[in-house]
Amino acid sequence: MELWYTDQHTKDVRFSIKMKEQLVSVESEFQRIDIIETYEYGRVLVLDGEMMITEKDEFIYHEMITHVPMAVHPNIRNVLVIGAGDGGTIRELTKYDTIEHIDMVEVDKEIVQVCREYMPFTACKLNDKRVSMHFEEGLRFVRGKQDEYDLIIVDCADPFGPAEGLFTREFYGNCYKALHDDGILINQHESPFYNEHSGSVQKAHRHITAVFPLSTVYQCHIPSYPSGHWLFGFASKKYDPIKDLNDKKWNELKLPVRYYNTDLHKGCFYLPNYVKELLGSYE
């Protein structure tokens, strides 16, 4: 008998992967956490039935959410990461010796424990001495912070359930206050392709542009995500993601990456027309 995991991309679209086995299933205080082993995509993290990351293509997501701002801002030392319980974003950040401190805020401690055991390819740097973990709501943690961070990365799940508060104008306003005068905010921006998701893209972009003087969107292709077309938000108090890109400096670091490069960096901000139209009234 064959086993298949099916991710519901929309009410009319599904994405199925042939499974080897279910490795673990845990019901935390906030959600159900599953890790499955698949033939094509390796290990897969599933929250409340929704696919979050896969072993095969997680590197795309984590490199794009991390290295884009790191190649723009000239002096990132203190970083706040909200979400990221799987550890992939932390793994990418710890490649930079210049980063001095990372606050990681994850509401669900159980995700971290499960990923440490079953997804070491993303959780491998959670014990880095520069990382401080805080198990609480990101919205609550950032509230009241003033002028503390060079970079904030919002690496959260979809805009419902435990992560819903991380897509509000109040949250983005608090992030603005928590950043230094030249700080950058990066958030995962969902997919613009399906109508069921495009409203979330518009809403997040509207809230961010109301707060930050410079706000734009960049894209990448993640095969296991709904439609494969995924967006990230880049919001900044000072730096332009293309004009202020220091490709020479970044390339001299010779970091081990599989997807991101500085040529791709320049191109990922050039959006297709349908995305421009979707976001146009808020640019």
From Swiss-Prot:
Q: Where does S-methyl-5'-thioadenosine bind?
A: 31, 106, 137-138, 162
Q: What class of enzyme is it?
A: transferase
Pathway membership, UniProt: Amine and polyamine biosynthesis; spermidine biosynthesis; spermidine from putrescine: step 1/1
Q: Which GO cellular component term is one of those annotated?
A: cytosol
The alphabetical list of record keywords is:
Cytoplasm, Polyamine biosynthesis, Spermidine biosynthesis, Transferase
Start and end residues of each PABS domain = 2-237
The protein's superkingdom reads: Bacteria
Q: Which Gene3D superfamilies match?
A: Spermidine synthase, tetramerisation domain, Vaccinia Virus protein VP39
Q: What is its main location?
A: cytoplasm
**Positions of spermidine binding:** 62, 86, 155-158
**Active site (UniProt):** 155
The record ties this protein, via PROSITE patterns, to: PABS_2 (PS51006)
Question: Which GO terms fall under molecular function for this chain's record?
Answer: spermidine synthase activity
Q: Which InterPro entries match?
A: PABS, SAM-dependent_MTases_sf, Spermi_synthase, Spermidine_synt_N, Spermidine_synt_N_sf
Instruction: Name the EC number(s).
Output: 2.5.1.16
What is this enzyme's catalytic activity, as reactions?
S-adenosyl 3-(methylsulfanyl)propylamine + putrescine = S-methyl-5'-thioadenosine + spermidine + H(+)
Location(s) in or outside the cell: Cytoplasm
Q: Which HAMAP family match?
A: Spermidine_synth (MF_00198)
Recorded family membership: Belongs to the spermidine/spermine synthase family.
- Any idea what job this protein has? Catalyzes the irreversible transfer of a propylamine group from the amino donor S-adenosylmethioninamine (decarboxy-AdoMet) to putrescine (1,4-diaminobutane) to yield spermidine.
This protein's assembly is summarised as:
Homodimer or homotetramer.
Q: What protein name applies here?
A: Polyamine aminopropyltransferase
Annotated organism of origin: Lachnoclostridium phytofermentans (strain ATCC 700394 / DSM 18823 / ISDg)
Organismal lineage: Bacteria, Bacillati, Bacillota, Clostridia, Lachnospirales
Gene transcribed to yield this protein: speE
